[in-house]
Amino acid sequence: MKFTQYFLYMRQRPDRAKIKMEWIEDTVKNPDCETIQLDGRNRKWKKIEEQGKFLRVVLLPDGETVHNAFFDRTFKGETK
């Protein structure tokens, strides 16, 4: 996996540092839901049972560079 500088910077935040890389990898490979944004970025969600929350991972249009990853408080499992 590749990462943007933005992702690496945001990963330093206390709330983001708790997100395990294995969760990000699993979300990218086996999402519960995914959509393509108008700018071509790919959003993928996966329920992280350990946390009881959905993790959203945003990939650049190349499909392999992680731009953002965070627990999505508004996503409830439906397609957006």
Regions found by a protein language model. Give the residues of each.
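Ribonuclease/tRNase effector modules and their secretory precursors
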Residues: M1-K80
